Amino acid sequence: MTMKRDLLLLPLLAFFLLTTACKDRKNTIRIATKPMTEQFILGEMLKLLIEQDTGLAVEITKGGGTSNIHPAMLKGEFDIYPEYTGTGWLVVLKKDSLLPPDTLYETLKKEYEQKFHLKWLSPYGFDNTHSL
């Protein structure tokens, strides 16, 4: 299989990224989403769950891409956003090839913690294969 096909077929699991950046905004969680319907829905789902289960206020910023959101996460401008394992691996960590899905998540999780002090939380439980 080609790299491109592997990328398209790889279950791009959506994960939460969470930092401790909300220290300055003690009662508000700031969520960022990418400019896609799927991301908008995930952001709203996160908002509802956080408000329901914590009582914290939630603000959503819609429409940024990984190249904007990731640096903002590092600066503490956002607290959480849904991201795809393939994007985190290839775009953020700038790796040349994908790992098998069963090892990608664990390796990605460790590298983000070491390099950025960001935590990947558990998968949502579905994947985005870009297939019909």
Describe each region flagged by the PLM:
Residues 26-38, 56-62:
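Short, well-ordered beta-strand elements
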Residues 18-21:
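C-terminal motif of bacterial Sec signal peptides marking the signal peptidase cleavage site
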Residues 2-9:
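Bacterial N-terminal signal peptides that target proteins for export
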Residues 36-40, 62, 66, 81-82, ...:
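Solvent-exposed, acidic/flexible segments
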Residues 86-132:
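Contiguous mixed-secondary-structure segments that line small-molecule binding/active-site clefts
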Residues 37-56:
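Short, polar/charged alpha-helical segment
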Residues 68-70:
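Short, hydrophobic alpha-helical packing/hinge segments within bilobed ligand-binding/sensory domains
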Residues 74-83:
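Alpha-to-beta junction loops
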